Each structure stands twice: as C-alpha cells, then as structure tokens.
Amino acid sequence: MAHVALYPGSFDPVTNGHVDVVRQACTLVDRLIVAIGVHPGKAPLFSVDERRAMIVEVFSPLAATTGCAIECVTFDNLTVAAAEKSGATILIRGLRDGTDLDYEMQIAGMNQTLVPSVQTIFIPASPTVRPITATLVRQIASMGGDVSAFVPKAVAARLKAKFSQ
C-alpha cells in the first residue's frame, strides 16, 4: 500500500523551510501532495498560479532524486477534508519550535476527531531553517533585503521581480 501524505500551506512564497520539510517527508511517503490553501480573506503576495509554478519548479528536481511522487493541488476547505478527498491518510506539518508544536497539537486533535482515518505527522525543521518564515521573507524582500539564504534561487528571483514592479 502506497503511503500518501498531504502537506498544506500558503507557500507565499516557498522557503527553504518548506524544502526541508518536503525533503524529510519524501523519506516517509511514496506520494506527497503539496496543497496550497486558498482563503478568500487573505491577500497573498503571489497568485495561486504563481505559487503553483514555484512549487513545481522547486520540488520537481527533489521528486526526481528521491523517487517520491510530488504533486500540487489547491484547496479552499478544511485541510483534513482536502487530505481525505485527495486520498491522503497522512497530514505533514513542519515544526520550528514549541509554539508551533502547541498550536499544531490542537489542530491535530481537532482533525483526528473530524476525520479519524487521517493521521498527523510532525516533522521538526532542521536547525538551519528554523528561523525562516514566509512572512519574514516577504518583509525582508519588500524592503530590498537579500533573501537568498532563506529561499530557493528561483523564488528569490521571483521575489525580486515582484518588488521591483
């Protein structure tokens, strides 16, 4: 039986932290669905299509080297419902620190009640990427800062282009 997991997030933009979690998740599952959450109340920097393009560009080489099938979908409902709909029995959540753990434990408990067949797996971020957040990356990039240490090269180029418009 193939192990299928869903890794949800806004991915606005994809960071080296996301890459770290995907790399680790690919050692655990056969198929990883990177799921872009679309929330009408939020105003992302990058459109859904731009985020999807970044995900494909960044993760396709990783899929080729790990043998893990990586695909990208969008969802606008409950994360656990998106997992169930896509055939995933595992939710992947990255953890940077204890604050993330406290929050994610609450969500995992609620998800377990809603859809008992979907389990949450927490993946601790590697020490080098723990301080990275997409919010901080956007802020640094918007002020002309160098974000190349925090995001893949292709994403850094997209951020630079976005803020030079």
UniProtKB/Swiss-Prot annotation:
Pathway(s) of this molecule: Cofactor biosynthesis; coenzyme A biosynthesis; CoA from (R)-pantothenate: step 4/5
GO molecular function: ATP binding; pantetheine-phosphate adenylyltransferase activity
Marked site: Transition state stabilizer: 18
Record keyword ATP-binding present: yes
Enzyme Commission code: 2.7.7.3
Catalyses which reaction(s): (R)-4'-phosphopantetheine + ATP + H(+) = 3'-dephospho-CoA + diphosphate
Superkingdom: Bacteria
Top EC class for this record: transferase
Primary localisation category: cytoplasm
Tagged with keyword Transferase: yes
Location in or out of the cell: Cytoplasm
Keywords: ATP-binding, Coenzyme A biosynthesis, Cytoplasm, Magnesium, Nucleotide-binding, Nucleotidyltransferase, Transferase
Coiled coil feature spans: none
Named cofactor requirement(s): Mg(2+)
Record-linked Pfam families: CTP_transf_like
Family named by the database record: Belongs to the bacterial CoaD family.
HAMAP family given in the database record: PPAT_bact
Function: Reversibly transfers an adenylyl group from ATP to 4'-phosphopantetheine, yielding dephospho-CoA (dPCoA) and pyrophosphate.
Subunit structure: Homohexamer.
Official protein name in the record: Phosphopantetheine adenylyltransferase
The organism of origin for this protein: Afipia carboxidovorans (strain ATCC 49405 / DSM 1227 / KCTC 32145 / OM5)
